[in-house]
């Protein structure tokens, strides 16, 4: 898999975690989902930058 495909996968994961975290599903899962959202959003941004710079085919 290319690095940009991984970046898109982490984007989808972060959006799903954001939906569960920011819509108020429950207090316990909302905190975990918010943390996961920020982690996967950061991974997405890093992989996106790497995909357009270092890992360009």
From Swiss-Prot:
The keyword Transmembrane applies. It is a multi-pass membrane protein. Keywords: Cell membrane, Membrane, Transmembrane, Transmembrane helix. InterPro entries: DUF1328. It comes from the Bacteria. Coiled coil: none annotated. The keyword Membrane applies. It is found in: Cell membrane. The chain crosses the membrane at residues 6-26, 35-55. NCBIfam families: PRK13682.2-2 (NF010232), PRK13682.2-5 (NF010234). Belongs to the UPF0391 family. This is UPF0391 membrane protein RPD_2934. It comes from Rhodopseudomonas palustris (strain BisB5).
């Amino acid at each position: 898999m290319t690095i940009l495909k991984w970046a898109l996968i982490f984007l989808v994961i972060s959006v799903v975690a954001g939906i569960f975290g920011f819509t108020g599903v429950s207090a316990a899962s909302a905190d975990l989902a918010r943390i996961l959202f920020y982690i996967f959003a950061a991974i997405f941004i890093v992989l996106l930058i790497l995909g357009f710079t270092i890992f360009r085919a």
